Amino acid sequence: MGGGDGHNDQDKGLFSNLAGGLAGGGHYPPGQYPPAAGGYPPQGYPPAGGGYPPQGYPPAGGGYPPQGYPPAGGGYPPQGYPPAGHHSGSSAPHHSGHGGVAGMVAGGRAAAAAAYGVHHMTQGHGSHGGHGGYAHGAMGMMPGMGAMAMASSSTVSTVMESLSRESTGRARSTDTRSGSNLSFSISSRTFWATK
C-alpha cells in the first residue's frame, strides 16, 4: 500500500477501481450546462398571444348564473309539487293502544331464550351432553371457553334481571349454589342465569 508511515493515500473508495472507466472521466454533468442555446423558459413559451385568462373567456354574455336560470316562474318548490291530495304528516305508522307492550314481551322472550342457552352451555349441557369429553373445568365446551361463557352469562343475567323487573316484577335472588343465581318467569317458564 503506500509508505511505511501509516497513512494510506491510495484508497479511493469501495469499487473505485471499477467505476473509473464507466463514467467517462468521472465528471458530471457531461458537456456544458446550461446548454448554450439559452436558459429558462424554453423558446416559444409563454405563447405570444397573452397571459391568463385565454382570449374569449369568460364569454361575453355574462357571468353566473347563465341567462334563463332560474326560470321566471318562481322558486322552490316548483309549481304543481307536491301533488294535489298529498298528506304532509309523519311517515311513521301510527298505532294506538298497547302495541309497545307486545314488542317488549317479544324482546323479553328472546332475551330469556338467550339466557337459557348460555346457562346450559356453562353448566355442561352442550350438544354432547355431560362434559362432552373435556375436562370438568371446560364445562362441556372446547378447552378454554368456560371463562368466556361465564362472562357472557353474567352480562345476560344483568340484562335479564332488569327485563324481569319491568315485565313481571317477580325477580328474586338466591344463593343456593356456589354463585348467586337469578330466576324469573316469562310465559310460565322459569329460567336460570348464573351471575
Swiss-Prot record:
Residues 82-94 have a biased composition (Low complexity). Residues 47-77 have a biased composition (Gly residues). Residues 23-103, 159-182 are annotated as: Disordered. Residues 163-175 have a biased composition (Basic and acidic residues). This is Glycine-rich protein A3. It comes from Daucus carota.
